[in-house]
């Protein structure tokens, strides 16, 4: 009661003195009507009530009724204190001011703006003389310095402010700690009590008002307030200052908040709610505490109730620490905070204008994205936009709550999508504020703010960061408003057709749309006549039925296209449909698309874009199924690998089937011919048909790609003849000992349709491209290349047309050769010295290549040829120049018979009847006439051991009529040839890599490069070696230029050139 009575007496004396000096003041006249109950109620009022009083004041109303009566004095003060144009218009109503349309000449300094409104309120400031204002401003600026920094440390010594400005802070704080008593000899260290509720003011809290009142009343008047009674009370209450540090409320915008204390102190001591931890600071060494000691910091339980909170609760401790760190517990009694708050939107500043614009105006998308994209996401993994846990979704699926994850997202999408965008923007909006606070803390700890210049730069940086946060947070607020506007317009059915609210920002009041937009919307509704109809919630059953009906309609009515799909999304939808149709969209990529913002329509089945996507996909699928199905051909690399695998499989199969015993062979007089055996036609061709089926079936239809297992002859013959490019079926039974006899005319009549059906009627693009390449190669080198291509294209399915000269592809190839080189002349196919052909074969094989597949040649060999012979035959066909061929030429020439020309090769053996000879002739001719078994014409260059035709062989021993075929036993060298040619190693350059013996490899290692790392200074270059066959085209080492795709024909062309050079060198 003594403290309350002293406060009332002090306040009455101050008001009486002020009424004498400012008798004409309207504000002071209002202040003289203070009542005791108002003063008592001020101490216990909640902060929210005070703010309600502030907002309820006429100055903040939009009607414009509250106009300052003290602005003339304020304009005079501006002329004394601030340089620059006036930012205050003649009409002082906030509701009628447009901050966007004002021209702000320059930015006011924060110190000037904050110091305009002082603790006496707006009404009292207007009547101060300029000199009194300067004195009050000085006290406020001193308190501002102390308030903004000295929560953890005092800046007075860091910035070198002398005792003339701030007083001896260190000595006064040290005296307070040691003696715990007030020394009246130092006027700056005496506090007085002003709250009617009995709370005590700290020394720093009463600095500003006491300094100002001391200036107004004079030293003698103020000293009268500090009588013996008051001093005794102060000394008694001194023990409370270490724990209780609340300050009386100084909200001075209304008369009830004018609690003022007088204290004549020329050297103030600036503090803010110091705790015992802060009292331990030694200002000579300037130790910076990292936080407040919550255990010793006691606050009134009736206000915040910290003591009632369980200290063992982690979240309670976090809450208290955050409140103390941010200083929320000091706002209620913080005079400076109240002054700064009252200044907002009262004095015109560009900061307030831009803040209003950013919160109420939605920027254009490109400008908004520019602002947000300049701020990067925080590095901490927890400070990201939260996503729904995948484990939670899996739990829903396991429990059967939802069928798919998309079903769950469809349910939460109406609100979750908008909230995620708000969270994303909030994280970026607070990032600059975090940077400012963090920079201040680091500066204090590292003691970098040691001069006024450093302080000015730090303030400028902080101001810039705060502006960025204001703009970003304002656009986040505007985004939330836009979401609400869209949802409301969607509910009444006006979202897509009504004018956009973004063009009508509301700066007048807090309504969502604003009066201007509502008037415009009313006019638009009257002009358009569009009815307003509130949408009703659709039951789940009807929604599912509607979705099913829409899906059915999209699959049946291909021409129905939505009318209002966003044109910006149409291109994305078209690209997605093409990827789905072409099969280039994997399930993993499709899952990732659901999280891509560009493909948002995949998760919104009710959107027009999704409907357009479904209809477009159904239409594309329908058109795709109506087209002829063209299967994709294998790549050249796949063809090469499969050909190699097929050749290995055939070789291993022959090794298993052929016996290991050497047979004596019969030497024949015929110079050339096909090797034959007595086995049946099906047995002769079973191996060859299986192999040929793999290659030729793939080139004909592209569907037979799996290597079949070894089968019997009937299955092999049926499969061979079932292919579309094969000759007509043979009526003879393939399982018999020999083919059934038929007349030659029948053979001719069936061979002609076969030859007409064998050529591929539909020549695909790959075959055409291969034919063009080969034609250019042959025209460039010569016709000999064609012969070598025919002999060595067994394992290359892309050159199938060389063995079927009646095909359209071969004709196209010959036309291209003649077109590129008109003077070229090909060797005649009917030369007497190079071919052995029967009349029937002459009809069937007219125009066919001179040499067929070595694979067929292997198939026509006897089943008892030695593996060594088989391997050497294959090596000769691949290497084209082995010693075997050159040594066999003279033997074949010596064995040549003059009457060998014109005779047809058969499967008969001397001693057998003529019926078997005649019967086997058409069977073998027909088997070799089709594309499955193309005819082979034997020349002296490819004649090998055991290939002398059967009718020209000389019978040296008596043979039974039924026996196995025999071979001629030549005296062959036991050892391997000295100059045996191997397969060129440089053909495998695609699999070769540099080793540590390579000079370039060693150079790179010396330069610091390691295997597996990229080239370049930062290791961002290529990791794999550059292909040997790729041309650099001027690029430097390690340049990742366009890779040249090498197909099978390129490899084949290189092999042909090397073998051709080797062939000519061996002649």
Curated annotation (Swiss-Prot):
Biased composition (Acidic residues): 866-883
Compartments in which it is found: Nucleus
Superkingdom as given in the UniProt entry: Eukaryota
GO cellular component, one term: nuclear body
Record's compositionally biased regions (Basic residues): 975-984
Main location: nucleus
Biological-process GO terms, alphabetical: mRNA processing; RNA splicing
Positions of region (Disordered): 177-199, 668-767, 825-944, 967-991
Modified residues (Phosphoserine): 93, 206, 267, 586, 740, 838
Residue interval(s) of motif Nuclear localization signal: 980-985
GO MF, one example: RNA binding
Matching SMART domains: G_patch (SM00443), SWAP (SM00648)
Start-end of each SURP motif repeat: 573-616, 770-813
A Pfam entry, by short name: Surp
Residue ranges occupied by any G-patch domain in the UniProt entry: 996-1042
Compositional bias of kind Polar residues: 680-691, 825-840, 919-931
Covalent cross-link (Glycyl lysine isopeptide (Lys-Gly) (interchain with G-Cter in SUMO2)), residues: 219
Job of this protein: May play a role in mRNA splicing.
Protein name (Swiss-Prot/TrEMBL): SURP and G-patch domain-containing protein 2
Gene responsible for this protein: Sugp2
